[in-house]
Amino acid sequence: MANNTRARRTARLSRALGIALTPKAAKYMERRPYGPGEHGRARKKQDSDYAVRLREKQRLRAQYGIREAQMTRAFEEARRTKGLTGENLIELLEMRLDALVLRAGFARTIAQARQLVVHRHILVDGIRVDRPSFRVGEGQLVHVHSRSETMPPFQVAAAGAHRDVLPQVPAYLDVKLDALQARLVRRPKRSEVPVTCEEQLVVEFYAR
């Protein structure tokens, strides 16, 4: 029951933001390609600049499943880092442990990836890490604990069951799926990160 409620809530959020946050939500949006609520089918009025920027920020937050405080901290770090703030922001978020667990194909959704980390199934360079926000460094190895490898969710993942979520592994990851291992070979580039976002709108939202 809880899973069904969560799935419906995610589907509703996906429709509101105009982006599928999970494979189930994508199927739901195919059946109902309009916003949620009784006025979902009605022609939408022109959004204000603020509303457009707010929605884009919410879209990015939702794709990484993070809280506003986490997003704000990441933005402040991105702003202080040399380069384009919007690109820096997405590159920093992509180096989160839960994001890389998802990209590697160990999980089907960001929520599942976060759960695997919190439940201490994931190691970084041989050390258990239970913080989804942990920043993985270049060259570090993300892998599943040996005692967890035989669990059904990981057996399913090792067989490639989640390849439809992300058919092509990003170039910044070296993944050995059968061994449930993934190495971050270098810092991600914004152009390679598989998230839908006009990051400049996010920058403008926080700079207001």
Swiss-Prot record:
- The species is Arthrobacter sp. (strain FB24)
Q: Residues in domain S4 RNA-binding?
A: 95-160
GO annotation, biological process: ribosomal small subunit biogenesis; translation
InterPro entries the UniProt entry points to: Ribosomal_uS4 (IPR022801), Ribosomal_uS4_bac-type (IPR005709), Ribosomal_uS4_CS (IPR018079), Ribosomal_uS4_N (IPR001912), S4_RNA-bd (IPR002942), S4_RNA-bd_sf (IPR036986)
Q: Which family does it belong to?
A: Belongs to the universal ribosomal protein uS4 family.
Q: Where is this region: Disordered?
A: 28-48
What subunit structure does UniProt give?
Answer: Part of the 30S ribosomal subunit. Contacts protein S5. The interaction surface between S4 and S5 is involved in control of translational fidelity.
UniProt lists the gene as rpsD
- Where does it sit, as one GO cellular component term? small ribosomal subunit
Query: Per its record, how is this protein called by name?
Result: Small ribosomal subunit protein uS4
What are the alphabetically sorted keywords of the record? Answer: Ribonucleoprotein, Ribosomal protein, RNA-binding, rRNA-binding
Could you cite one Gene Ontology molecular function of this protein? structural constituent of ribosome
Please describe what this protein does: One of the primary rRNA binding proteins, it binds directly to 16S rRNA where it nucleates assembly of the body of the 30S subunit.
Matching entries from SMART domains are given as: Ribosomal_S4, S4
